[in-house]
Amino acid sequence: MINWTYEIGVRDSKLLNDDKIDKIASILIKKIPFAVYVLTQSGYNKMINKGFNANVIKFFIHTQSILNFQKRYEFDKKIIIDKYSTLNAINNYQRKMSFIKDFSEFYKKNELMYFLEHGEQKIQAIACASIIARHYLNNYMKNQNDKWGFNFLLGANQKVKSQINEFTKKFGKQNLEKVIKTNFKI
């Protein structure tokens, strides 16, 4: 299973441009089982406003994606996740999300979960998942650009700040939370 992923160029998605990601993802989504969870900017902002930080939100998205996968496919294999924080912090994120019944039940019964630092560079399955996730983000942003007739940039830099001002003038501040993550300091 793994060799063909190398042949089509699967590697750490941070090393690939968006065109390459979309090309590779179009092959992956036809050949491997996957599930995604898309958190809109509005949903992200609501979670921030409720006091969750970016890492807790990342934990939420990972868990929701795994639950979506579990609903679509039967599996009893180990789950390997790119370790994006310390294990103590991840356990804390889990406690913060334990009010969500599906999450709480999932973590009680799932002992086959491992966090691997720089997992995207070491495990092809993680690299594949990251490429598919980025592909879905690319498509989401393309649809958002088309909907608003506005080319949104990703990131938090001076160009994005100028773009926020331009968007606000054109569409009003009330629409800002629908299209950007409002907690970034630029």
Each model region followed by its residue ranges:
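Acidic (Asp/Glu) carboxylate-rich active-site/surface patches
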Residues: 1-186
